[in-house]
Amino acid sequence: MKVRVDVMPKEGVLDPQGKAIGHALGTLGFTGVNDVRAGKVIVLDLEETDPARARSTAEEMARKLLANTVIEGFRVEVAAE
């Protein structure tokens, strides 16, 4: 079962990567970009067949390793099969 984990900096946490991307976009002539937040996407292919258990497992993985929960939030999405 495919599970997607989106990890993003929490609101109010400095995001230097997002700021650098925003600056680069402006340098390239793109206008109207008010803010950029940069995170990561992790796609897991789990052997689990029960969507609820797959979600629970991915959430535990995110809390323990995939996200630094002090400064990052995460969202888990189980792919419909």
Language-model region placement:
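Short glycine-/aliphatic-rich beta-strand segments at the starts of folded cytosolic domains
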Residues: 1-11, 40-44
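Solvent-exposed beta-strand sheet faces enriched in polar/charged residues
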Residues: 6, 36, 45, 77-79
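Short amphipathic alpha-helix segments
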Residues: 12-28
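Short, conserved charged micro-motifs
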Residues: 13-16, 49-56
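Conserved functional loop/turn residues at catalytic and ligand-binding sites
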Residues: 29, 45, 69
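N-terminal glycine-rich anion-binding loops that anchor highly charged ligand groups
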Residues: 30-37
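C-terminal structural segments of small proteins and small subunits
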Residues: 52-81
